[in-house]
Swiss-Prot record:
Oxalate binds at K99, K196, T266. One of its GO terms (cellular component) is cytoplasm. Induction: In response to ammonium, tryptophan, glucose, and phosphate starvation. Pfam families: FAA_hydrolase. Requires a divalent metal cation for activity. It catalyses: oxaloacetate = enol-oxaloacetate; oxaloacetate + H(+) = pyruvate + CO2. Tautomerase that converts enol-oxaloacetate to the keto form of oxaloacetate. Also shows weak oxaloacetate decarboxylase (ODx), catalyzing the decarboxylation of oxaloacetate (OAA) to pyruvate and CO(2). Mn(2+) binds at E148, E150, D179. Keywords: Cytoplasm, Isomerase, Lyase, Manganese, Metal-binding. Its cofactor is Mg(2+); Mn(2+). The gene is yisK. One of its GO terms (biological process) is oxaloacetate metabolic process. This is Oxaloacetate tautomerase YisK. Its EC number is 5.3.2.2, 4.1.1.112. It comes from Bacillus subtilis (strain 168).
Length: 301
């Protein structure tokens, strides 16, 4: 099941992708098919409803397969809908994991940079932007804008002191994040927040895939292309700290809540890792692909 936040005719809605070609407006479908109005207006609110929401969405998808003269009132072609980030306005900072792939840690320094414990930082919620949106170049403050293709985990059930064994019970699903970074600001300020939190530097999407559709997230492949050139190619199995380990570590003294976003780290091949570095410039297009989530595409303005 692939969920999305769509916009059509200046109206935002929670959508369910059907056959990778159509998108169902869940609120309108519920009203037409069941004469109910129980589905919240934002995906983050839907996530908080947990299994109840997922079961209801699955039921609506099954009903929509039946002959219905009013199908056009809640089912649209995906090509006519603007996809925003699945969670356009997170309620808190995006949790990010640094140097979680051995080769990336080495390209950023040396083997001494391979962490013994998860390196955790955050990005401001105002950084979030969607698939197809323009990313600001921020040329007035940085000359070292860099890309980082990442698998992101979205929490579905709140919890504290979550064990590795129970971690996946607290996951709602998976999406793609581009953790765009101003390397010079990151170095100058000796702390990641400013270099990671420029406006529009957290493209997310294009959809949020429910965990039931991804049985083995550790097998997911991450590929990043810049202007068509393959720059990053890695597997989630190469993470130093697995998704369950990250959830266990983060939740030991901090409550993880439904809708929280964890960007799990990037493989090697970032711009800074090349000699000379290949930083982003105005006009560059970045495509990050993780099947079956899809491809997150953005261009530098």
């Amino acid at each position: 099941m692939k969920f999305a936040t769509g916009e059509l005719y200046n109206r935002m809605f929670v959508g369910l992708i059907i056959d990778d070609e159509k998108i169902m407006d869940l609120q309108k479908a519920e009203k037409k098919l069941f004469e109910l109005e129980t589905i919240p207006g934002s995906l983050i609110e839907c996530i908080a409803e947990g299994d109840k929401f997922v079961a209801h969405a699955r039921q609506l998808a099954e009903w929509a397969k039946k002959p219905n003269d009013e199908l056009g009132s809640f089912m649209y072609s995906l090509s006519e809908v603007k996809l925003h980030a699945p969670i356009p306005k997170p309620s808190k900072n995006i949790i990010c994991i640094g140097k979680n792939y051995r080769d990336h840690a080495i390209e950023m320094g040396s083997e001494a940079d391979i962490p013994e414990h998860p390196m955790v930082f955050t990005k401001s919620p105002v950084t979030v932007t969607g698939h197809g949106d323009i990313v600001k170049s921020h040329e007035e403050v940085t000359s070292q804008l860099d890309y980082e293709g990442e698998l992101a985990v979205v929490i579905g059930k709140s919890g504290t002191r979550i064990s590795k064994e129970d971690a996946y019970d607290h996951v709602f699903g998976y999406t793609i994040v581009n953790d765009i970074t101003a390397r010079d600001l990151q170095k100058r300020h000796k702390q990641f927040f400013i270099g990671k939190s420029l406006d529009t530097t957290c493209p997310m999407g294009p959809v949020l895939v429910h965990k039931s559709s991804i049985q083995e997230p550790e097998r997911l492949k991450v590929e990043t292309r810049v202007n068509g050139e393959l720059r990053q190619s890695g597997s989630a199995s190469d993470m130093i700290f697995s998704i369950p380990e990250l959830i266990e570590t983060l939740s030991k003294g901090m409550t993880l809540e439904a809708g929280d976003i964890i960007a799990t780290g990037t493989p090697s091949g970032v711009g800074k890792g090349f000699t000379p570095p290949k930083f982003l410039r105005s006009g560059d297009k970045i495509d990050i692909t993780i099947d079956p989530i899809g491809t997150l595409s953005n261009q530098i303005g």
